Amino acid sequence: MTQLEMARQGIVSDKMKQAAADAGIDAEILRQRIAEGTAIVCHNNMHANGRPLAVGKGLPTRVNANIGTSKDDTSIDNELEKARVAVAAGADAIMDLSTGGPIDEIRRAIIAETQACIGSVPLYQAACDTVVKKGKAIVDMTADEIFDGIKKHLDDGVDFITVHCGVTLSTVERMDNEGRIMDVVSRGGSFTVAWMTHNNAENPLYEQYDRLLELVKPYDATLSLGDGFRPGCLADATDRAQIHELIILGELTQRAWDAGIQVMIEGPGHVPLNQIEANIQLQKSLCHGAPFYVLGPLVTDIAPGYDHITCAIGGAVAAGAGADFLCYVTPSEHLCLPNVQDVHDGVMATRIAAHAADIVKGLPGAMEKDIAMSKARKGLDWETQYCLAIDPELARKRRGESGVDEEHGACTMCGEFCAYKVMDERKPKQ
């Protein structure tokens, strides 16, 4: 039985117990939410060293880090270091999006490197193999090659796979009729639309969705239903193509649940601040409360080099409104492949957004951390502040580099004129 099937039969599995303990939630409550589809336990039966990850309603907002090679940078060592840095920085999951070099070897090395939840987009490799190994165009892929690629990733232990099943001929027609500035910016979505247009055929992952469900079920992996029509700029947000795809994903969610397979839904993208909450409400309604996994959202299009900040702003609003899983964006977004420092900075920025949202959600223990930090600050207790900081190493480093005079105990911003010290001096001396 799958985790969903066990949950529906009232069985609390070992994976549920482990994931619940890691999340700080009662295992029976987690089971109930898995049964209703509002939470998942993400773990492939083939991922021997992986820890099950609980995502969804009433759980900590999760953070994913995307890594992976490109044709221009195929170093396995670089990607393994990014994986290590992402986990050390607090990422809950890692997606390998490699499109260059020995892709199988890279994915297997990343899976072996960490216990973190691992995701991938099998279509990327299917497309790359078609071009590099077979000398054909992406549009010449066969449906069997797409499904064979999915099976290979599942065999390797990938815990969740992004599949662009909601990219359909009817959605393409709506996009073309309404018009967009940036058309399709999802890489997997663009591959699929190009294939459909060239072959004048429906998306195999939609047309043969039952085949996909049968393939995934023995692994008990999670389907991450990709948003091929996510907006790539603010002006394209919340248009007909995006929402039509979301309606389809809601239908596919129910079909997956009927087959005993866990699902989460992927979301935008680039979205103006005043539209983010509405996007979350639409997803939760149309997709029946399934966990929502959003990329950002980025709240402006003009900040290349700072898109980890635009992502964190949107991510905090989205998660505060009910999004469950935030995919980070790094400072290199829209510019180049991220380096190791970019990965660290992206994870930290998105963790800040996730924590801010957990306070809004009333997650047990979230606000308590901030209260403890406030008390340590008032008492000029620097060691406790370092321990409570989201990035202890950076906090210690910046203070240490400042040349602070430890005799007054404050920092170089105020020194002896520190407000805490001034207020402390007005207290009666014992």
Curated annotation (Swiss-Prot):
<keyword id="KW-0862">Zinc</keyword>
<comment type="pathway">
    <text>Cofactor biosynthesis; thiamine diphosphate biosynthesis.</text>
</comment>
<keyword id="KW-0479">Metal-binding</keyword>
<comment type="subunit">
    <text>Homodimer.</text>
</comment>
<feature type="binding site">
    <location>
        <position position="164"/>
    </location>
    <ligand>
        <name>substrate</name>
    </ligand>
</feature>
<dbReference type="Pfam" id="PF01964">
    <property type="entry name" value="ThiC_Rad_SAM"/>
</dbReference>
<dbReference type="InterPro" id="IPR002817">
    <property type="entry name" value="ThiC/BzaA/B"/>
</dbReference>
<keyword id="KW-0004">4Fe-4S</keyword>
<keyword id="KW-0456">Lyase</keyword>
<comment type="similarity">
    <text>Belongs to the ThiC family.</text>
</comment>
<keyword id="KW-0411">Iron-sulfur</keyword>
<protein>
    <recommendedName>
        <fullName>Phosphomethylpyrimidine synthase 2</fullName>
        <ecNumber>4.1.99.17</ecNumber>
    </recommendedName>
</protein>
<dbReference type="InterPro" id="IPR037509">
    <property type="entry name" value="ThiC"/>
</dbReference>
<keyword id="KW-0408">Iron</keyword>
<dbReference type="GO" id="GO:0008270">
    <property type="term" value="F:zinc ion binding"/>
</dbReference>
<feature type="binding site">
    <location>
        <position position="95"/>
    </location>
    <ligand>
        <name>substrate</name>
    </ligand>
</feature>
<feature type="binding site">
    <location>
        <position position="266"/>
    </location>
    <ligand>
        <name>substrate</name>
    </ligand>
</feature>
<dbReference type="GO" id="GO:0016830">
    <property type="term" value="F:carbon-carbon lyase activity"/>
</dbReference>
<dbReference type="GO" id="GO:0005829">
    <property type="term" value="C:cytosol"/>
</dbReference>
<feature type="binding site">
    <location>
        <position position="66"/>
    </location>
    <ligand>
        <name>substrate</name>
    </ligand>
</feature>
<dbReference type="GO" id="GO:0009228">
    <property type="term" value="P:thiamine biosynthetic process"/>
</dbReference>
<dbReference type="GO" id="GO:0051539">
    <property type="term" value="F:4 iron, 4 sulfur cluster binding"/>
</dbReference>
<feature type="binding site">
    <location>
        <position position="334"/>
    </location>
    <ligand>
        <name>Zn(2+)</name>
    </ligand>
</feature>
<dbReference type="GO" id="GO:0009229">
    <property type="term" value="P:thiamine diphosphate biosynthetic process"/>
</dbReference>
<comment type="function">
    <text>Catalyzes the synthesis of the hydroxymethylpyrimidine phosphate (HMP-P) moiety of thiamine from aminoimidazole ribotide (AIR) in a radical S-adenosyl-L-methionine (SAM)-dependent reaction.</text>
</comment>
<feature type="binding site">
    <location>
        <position position="270"/>
    </location>
    <ligand>
        <name>Zn(2+)</name>
    </ligand>
</feature>
<keyword id="KW-0949">S-adenosyl-L-methionine</keyword>
<feature type="binding site">
    <location>
        <position position="124"/>
    </location>
    <ligand>
        <name>substrate</name>
    </ligand>
</feature>
<feature type="binding site">
    <location>
        <position position="411"/>
    </location>
    <ligand>
        <name>[4Fe-4S] cluster</name>
    </ligand>
</feature>
<feature type="binding site">
    <location>
        <position position="418"/>
    </location>
    <ligand>
        <name>[4Fe-4S] cluster</name>
    </ligand>
</feature>
<dbReference type="InterPro" id="IPR038521">
    <property type="entry name" value="ThiC/Bza_core_dom"/>
</dbReference>
<feature type="binding site">
    <location>
        <begin position="227"/>
        <end position="230"/>
    </location>
    <ligand>
        <name>substrate</name>
    </ligand>
</feature>
<feature type="binding site">
    <location>
        <position position="293"/>
    </location>
    <ligand>
        <name>substrate</name>
    </ligand>
</feature>
<feature type="binding site">
    <location>
        <begin position="186"/>
        <end position="188"/>
    </location>
    <ligand>
        <name>substrate</name>
    </ligand>
</feature>
<feature type="binding site">
    <location>
        <position position="414"/>
    </location>
    <ligand>
        <name>[4Fe-4S] cluster</name>
    </ligand>
</feature>
<keyword id="KW-0784">Thiamine biosynthesis</keyword>
